[in-house]
Structures are given as structure tokens and as C-alpha cells.
Amino acid sequence: FANGGYKVEPGFILKVEDANGEVLFEKKEVKPSRVIDEKVAFLMNSMLSDNSARLITFGENSYLNLGSRSVAVKTGTTNDMRDNWTVGWTSDVVVGVWVGNNDNSPMKNVASGVSGAAPIWRKQMLDVLSMYPDNGFSVPEGVEEVEVDRVSGYPAHDGFAAYKEWVIGGTLPTGEDKIHQQVKVCKNDETRLANPVQVIQGNYNGKEFIVLKEDDPLTDKNLWQIGIDAWVSKQADDKYRPPTEFCESASGLDVQIISPKDRSRINSTSVEFRFEI
């Protein structure tokens, strides 16, 4: 990621000379090989350097936040708490920190990478970065910054809340945004659907709801939707729960046949009916 998608073999010893200056060993230069598309590498760097993207988990002022410096960083912890990592990088430098016991026993007072390795990583990274300018991550050709709907991920539309995001050109979803839906509801009770009579008469209000529906490509039992529904059930905002019941009976519909007239004789195999509601 730090090299824009190129893999570079690390070298710990560059050269060894004897007392007379004779070279005993010198690391051979190995040509970097591309393993990730540069556009994908940039998006990963953008996500992992975005402090707002990790607010829910780590908070605004965690050890991972280095202020104005563009630093991508990732933490990691093994399930048994034996290994604890924080690895961060810019386009100039990579710093990785491991924390653990030398006898490989589980750690008792370290909960995650952000509380174990991150404090050490932060100090080392700030010291190293003081020697480099803040060049950020270069935006490769084919990547563009666009306005994206905050809920659906579709291109921003209809004034819904949106934010700026880096994307690979041509990868944004197209077509109708089915997550934002304008539902026809009763004027006197917007928790219920307008019935067909009210819809025909135009006697309804349009109200926005967020409809979260997903198909599970892996199992017959839609585990994705089960998880979504569980999350929706905990939300206080009713916009995640579109109504399913009508507000009142549609039995009051008055329909009059205008054509053909009563007792008319029909001699054609096709008949056109006209109604007045």
C-alpha cells in the first residue's frame, strides 16, 4: 500500500565491509513487482488514513490520530491476546510495532492494538515523520472524488445527506436508488399506507423511508437480512421502518362506467371501457 501497489522486498543489512573497506556483502537491488492496482492501493490508503472512518471504534483522539499528517494505519490482535500489532505508513516511511510476552503467554492488561502497540507506534511515527514533509498519497489517474449518498452509496441525489469520497471511475452503482423510497402515506396518519382510493384521488402525502434489503448469495437462509432487520429494530428513527398497513378501508370507492352505455349492443370482438371515479 505504501508503495502504491508495488511489493518491495525488505532488506535489513545493506552492506558489510571489513577493516580495510573491502565489501564483504552488499544487498542486491530487487526490482519491485506490482501486486495491487495503484487505484486500489490508493483507496485503501485513503480509508485507513481517514480518522472519521474509525470514530465509532476508536474515538476522535485515539493514538492512531496524528493530526494533520496523512498516515494510513491498521491495528490487529490475535484472539488469544498473544500478539498485538499496529502498522502505519506514509508514502515515505512504514513503522510497525508488535507487543507481546517473550514466552508467548496471553497478555492480561492489553485489550487491543490501539491500547497495546499503538502508543509505542505513535511516538515512533511522530519522531520519524519530523524528518519528512507531509506529501500525502498521490492520487492516481482513474480515481476521482465525488459526492456520494451517505446511506445508499449511490451518487448524491435529491438533496439527501451526502459526503465526498474517492472512487475508481465507473464503479459507482447506477440506476434507481431503491434504498431511498418515497412512500405514499395517509395525510392524517403517516404511519400507515394510503389506500388505493386515496392514491387515485391524490389524497396522500409522500414520505421518505430508508429500505434496507439484501439477498444472501451464500445461504438459503438470508442471514444478511436477519442481521439488517436486527439492526433496524434497534433504531429509534421510524424512517427505517416503512408502513405495511393501510390507514383505512378502500371500500368507499365509487366507480361509474361511462362507456359502453347501459344495455348497449356490442358487435365487436374488442371493447373499450371508460370509467369515472
Per-region residue spans from a language model:
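A conserved catalytic-loop motif detector
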Residues: 1-75, 79
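Soluble, non-transmembrane domains of envelope/secretory-pathway proteins that act on or interact
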Residues: 17, 25, 29-32, 70-277
